[in-house]
């Protein structure tokens, strides 16, 4: 027989994954920086600025790293979680999830090329088609998000809203980049 439990709500900001979405240059990175400054101090707030994202550049005092591809991102996350004593941060942002998705797609396309010795036309054609490429992208992203969630760090995901309307799980209309929508619709339980 199942035991009835009472749900407890946490008021610790690190216990949730936060999603900040908005138009370019509206202040998403600034919002994360200010939340970090108030909650734990800027010295304990880290921005993972993906690829060519530059929102962190106008935020004085905000620590950041700038992985240029999926392998650099993965290696950094692995090191940060494996050796937390070297990373005194409490809050971490991935800025932006749009670039993270693009990096994951590039990684999957390279893996396809290595395995099949020929390029595929799109992510949909990777690994024989039928959504296998998208599934591989979702796995890569979900694994990294879960790794961070299971660690000591609070996680903020920052993204751009654009291109296509989508309704989130609470019925709120948002607009997201098509590739980001495809990936995060599969991992919505992770995003919170």
Spans of features found by a protein language model:
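Phosphate-binding/switch region of NTP-binding enzymes
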Residues: 6, 147, 154-192
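Amphipathic alpha-helical transducer elements in NTP-driven molecular machines
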Residues: 67-74, 91, 127, 131-142, ...
């Amino acid at each position: 027989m199942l035991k009835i439990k009472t749900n407890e709500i946490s008021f610790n900001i690190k216990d949730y994954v936060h999603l900040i979405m908005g138009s370019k240059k509206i202040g998403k990175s600034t919002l994360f920086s200010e939340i970090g400054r108030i909650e734990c101090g800027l010295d304990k707030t880290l921005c993972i600025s993906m690829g060519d994202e530059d929102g962190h550049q106008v935020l004085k005092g905000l620590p950041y790293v700038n992985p240029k591809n999926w392998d650099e991102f993965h290696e950094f996350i692995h090191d940060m979680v494996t050796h937390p004593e070297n990373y005194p941060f409490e809050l971490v942002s991935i800025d932006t999830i749009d670039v993270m998705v693009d990096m994951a797609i590039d990684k999957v396309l390279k893996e396809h090329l290595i395995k099949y010795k020929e390029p595929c036309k799109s992510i949909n054609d990777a690994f024989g088609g039928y959504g296998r490429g998208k599934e591989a992208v979702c796995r890569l992203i979900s694994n990294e998000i879960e790794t961070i969630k299971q660690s000591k760090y609070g996680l903020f995901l920052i993204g751009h809203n654009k291109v296509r309307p989508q309704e989130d799980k609470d019925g709120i209309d948002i607009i997201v980049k098509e590739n980001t929508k495809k990936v995060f619709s599969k991992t919505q339980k992770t995003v919170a």
